[in-house]
Amino acid sequence: MPRIHILDEETVSRIAAGEVIERPASVVKELIENSIDAGASRIIIEVENGGISLIKLVDDGCGIEREDLPLAFQRHATSKISTADDLFRLKTLGFRGEALSAIASVSKCVEVHTRTRYSPVGTYLRLENGRVAEIKDDGCPYGTSIEVRGLFETIPARLKHLSSPSQELARIAEIVTQMAIIHHRISFELSSGRRTLFRSNASETWDDALIRAFGLRTAKGMISIIAEGDGFDLHGMISSHDSSHHGSELILVYVNSRPVYSKVVVQALREAYRGFLQSGRSPLAVISIEIEPSLVDVNVHPAKREVRFLREDEVYDAVRDAALSALRSSAIPSPPPPARIAEPQLWSAKPQIQRTLPLEVQAEQRISEPLIRIVGQALDLYIIVEDDDGIMLVDQHAAAERIRYEHLLEKCKSGSISQELIQPVTVELSPGEVALLDSFSGELGEIGFEIDPFGGRAYSVRSVPAAAGLESPESIRDVLREILNLGRVCRASFRDEALKHLACRGSIKSGERLSESAMLRLLTDLFACDNPRTCPHGRPVVVRISSESLEKMFGRR
């Protein structure tokens, strides 16, 4: 019996659909793109259970003719292209004729109500497990309404690997927000249950969408960039050097109004920001590039998430130079202090001042003999310690992180971690962050946050984790957003990951010069920890070099 055989059409369709439709947010993205291509001026999205149970999209676009409707759900059926040459002249978002077919293949049921401007009556279509079950006349309004139910019910393995409903909802909110920014002439609305997560008004500029996406405070801190190249134009908004944010960078890139990932654009922005951002700060940027279709390949990724420019160097230079010019104009950084010429020195130490430190740790955790001596500090990062058996290098940041983590964990377990603020701090969240806050409100309470709704997407923070170093309103806003975004990837260990993040954020940093007393205090606290060997993330805190190893290095043995 042959071991290789040709798959049946249904299996092939489901495999292909899995490349296009990865999660509920993929469905929302594809449906929005279809609505935009249909000339919609208003798009309303409603979801239930993070889009797993229901995704409903209603638009006022051109609608679909009755004879075309069944074809729209067949693979490679499209009105956008006819030949391979058309791929190099594309100006629409959808073009491969795979989206609707893929959605129907991985859903239990899809229902469509649609009507064109010139039709006296609309059409209703129901598909079950990818096959047409019913089609009839319908008295629906102009435009199209699509309901997708039971996503991935026919593919249990894919359903099993979805995140929680709140995390899937956060991803949907991100997609809607991204589309609303670049397609600002269209009004968008996203709701889950009875709650409206996002709403934008149609506008000639993207100012309103930026405010609704990032909040007024963040949007006001952004500066405009503009540039031209051979066959392309770009414009965008980037955060100024003093309005950047903590955490990972947030760079939204659009090519011909399509949200994509572009390594070239991201690298160009990073290069522009070099020297402008303080340690731990990241840029926020929204970049739109309009380029001749023949100069960009949008068919690189199955889900159209990545593009490839024909002349990458020109795009890189244009983005970098435009961002650099805007950053220099918005603020001139203070010149660095004149360099001090000194003899080369590996570490700072004062031999005449010796500090000894008795260690009291459990036998199985013992790192050294009961008495050690602080030699000094190397590279403003490592504390050098000597004992009878050799030397130890202690990573000061990892050590401080371990100390703070165990302190926060102890307070969390005892229920004494919450610290009430003298003045509540108001925080405006993105639609995705609102979804995560609803999901993780209990866990946030466990680690010391007390947060109340304040209207719209604004929230009042009344208490924060004690000993977390959250002193300013800005630091509270930043850390809350950072912790919420941890929930996108670590649902099961959210509380522990949040405590690790708090510990890392407030710890002594690399490059910080410490006095002898500060080093002594740090080591005392470290060796009192339950686990002084590693930081909360698993990196080593202490590296030992024995006397015997040193002698071998220098050929004494």
From Swiss-Prot:
InterPro entries per UniProt: DNA_mismatch_repair_CS, DNA_mismatch_repair_MutL, DNA_mismatch_S5_2-like, HATPase_C_sf, MutL/Mlh/PMS, MutL/Mlh/Pms-like, MutL_C, MutL_C_dimsub
Pfam families to which the protein is assigned, alphabetical: DNA_mis_repair (PF01119), HATPase_c_3 (PF13589), MutL_C (PF08676)
Tagged with keyword Membrane: no
Gene3D superfamilies: 3.30.230.10, Histidine kinase-like ATPase, C-terminal domain, MutL, C-terminal domain, dimerisation subdomain, MutL, C-terminal domain, regulatory subdomain
Keyword field contains DNA repair: yes
Disulfide bonds: none
One Gene Ontology cellular component annotation held by this UniProt entry: mismatch repair complex
Gene Ontology MF terms: ATP binding; ATP hydrolysis activity; ATP-dependent DNA damage sensor activity; mismatched DNA binding
Protein name: DNA mismatch repair protein MutL
